[in-house]
Design a protein with these regions (language model features):
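Surface-exposed, interaction-prone regions used to assemble/regulate multi-protein complexes
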Residues: 77-79
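Low-complexity, polar/charged sequence tracts that form flexible coils or short amphipathic helices
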Residues: 54-56, 81, 100-103
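A glycine-rich, hydrophobic loop/mini-helix early in the fold
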Residues: 33-75
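Short, surface-exposed coil-to-beta transition loops
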Residues: 59, 83-85, 105
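Extracellular beta-strand scaffolds
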Residues: 95-96
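Low-complexity or membrane-interfacial segments used for flexible interactions
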Residues: 1-29, 103-177
Length: 177
């Protein structure tokens, strides 16, 4: 099956950004807009989960490569709180830590070392939009590497999560006979 390539995101800082997501094959490639190429891959033989665009949240079954360099990818399992759906990247190449955390039903915020970089929206189908903060949170501007990480995480895992009360109610109802 060919990867799904959507109309490129029109990023306000970097121009056209392509996200090619293939749920069945477990691959995502982010490119264009002067960004370093980002690839997220699901390990062969891993049964895909339909509610995760890349197919799994198991860190042992995923790899992240940006500009040819393997980075540490740590998606949380996701359960009762929005924060439990966070995805962390520890970047040896950049010497920093990125975190994508849901902050509403449809959006997630990307931070670098605790400083807000921007807010992403993705419905989990490979289409992604970004709204950047002017200073990138820590006084450093948002760079192409930051954008590549953000687009890759948003496209691979989707953005947003239900509020805690609804997640809790759904968990209780799932246990009800």
């Amino acid at each position: 099956m060919d990867p799904f390539v959507y109309v490129p995101a029109d990023d306000p800082l970097f121009g056209a950004v392509d996200c090619a997501l293939d749920h069945d094959a477990g691959t995502l490639v982010v490119s264009g807009g002067g960004l370093p190429r980002a690839e997220v891959r699901r390990a062969a033989g891993t049964t895909p989960e339909s509610h995760v665009p890349i197919g799994t949240r198991d860190p042992g079954s995923l790899t992240l490569r940006i500009d040819g360099i393997d980075e540490t990818l740590r998606p949380s399992k996701g359960f009762l709180t929005r924060r439990s759906y966070r995805v962390e990247v520890v970047s040896g190449a950049q010497g920093c830590r990125y975190l994508l955390v849901p902050d509403s039903l449809g959006t997630s915020r990307l931070s670098r070392d605790g400083g807000l970089l921007g807010v992403f929206t993705s419905t989990g189908d490979g289409s992604v939009t970004a709204e950047w903060q002017a200073e990138g949170g820590s006084g450093r501007g948002v760079g192409p590497y930051d954008a590549s990480v953000g687009y890759a995480l948003a496209a691979a895992f989707g953005t947003g999560a239900e509020p805690m009360w609804k997640l809790t109610l759904n968990a209780v109802l799932d246990l009800w006979p």
